[in-house]
């Protein structure tokens, strides 16, 4: 059986500074399991159950094989549930259920509910502020977090409602209607988690409305 490895970009935050996280997913032979390595915190380890349910309830097949996901760099602790979405996308790409094309230029963030819906999380703004320096210009995240991400000038923001919508965008190779384009810098009254942010990006259209 051929071993397949996918790579999906995500973000982490240390203090108020964001950094790039590469989510590598290996699917191979062996006893069925789903392991996450790379200093995952408790919420990250619990992603195994959320991702498994979300994938199955979104109309996809969760692979009954040995799955190992690595969150690189491996020497920095990873916290929070925002790695749910990149983990799910990485598994589906490694299993050949969605194409890998857009994965090399998009960044994914978002907590998954058991039915495949996307939930917002904290720390989106400082994470996304790091993207221009990293040379990445597109982020896919929960629709309720799109306003925060739109505070980053020039950033293409895809606010999505569920995993199925994300996968449709990946299959199409583009965000619906060009996504939302960031047009301003974060204001001085906004905290590290974007509290106080107001949407100023021009909305060209999301794939689906917020649930």
What are these regions, as identified by a protein language model?
Residues 1-211:
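Peripheral, non-AAA+ core regions of ATP-driven protein-machinery
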């Amino acid at each position: 059986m051929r071993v397949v490895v996918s790579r999906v970009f995500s973000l982490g935050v240390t203090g108020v500074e964001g950094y790039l996280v590469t989510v590598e997913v290996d699917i191979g032979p062996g006893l069925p399991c789903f392991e996450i390595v790379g200093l995952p915190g408790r919420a990250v380890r619990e992603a195994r159950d959320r991702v498994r349910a979300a994938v199955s309830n979104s109309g996809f097949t969760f692979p009954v094989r040995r799955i190992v996901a690595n969150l690189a760099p491996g020497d920095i602790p990873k916290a929070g549930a925002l790695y749910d979405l990149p983990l799910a996308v990485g598994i589906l790409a490694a299993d050949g259920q969605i194409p890998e094309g857009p994965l090399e230029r998009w960044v994914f963030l978002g907590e998954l509910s058991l039915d495949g819906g996307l939930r917002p999380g904290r720390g989106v703004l400082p994470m996304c502020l790091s993207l221009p320096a990293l040379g990445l210009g597109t982020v896919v995240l929960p629709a309720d977090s799109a306003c925060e991400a739109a505070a980053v000038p020039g950033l293409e923001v895809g606010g999505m409602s569920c995993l199925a919508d994300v996968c449709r965008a990946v299959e199409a190779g583009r965000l619906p209607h060009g996504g939302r384009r960031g047009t301003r810098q974060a204001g001085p009254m906004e905290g590290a988690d974007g509290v106080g942010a107001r949407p100023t990006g021009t909305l060209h259209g999301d794939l689906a409305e917020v649930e």
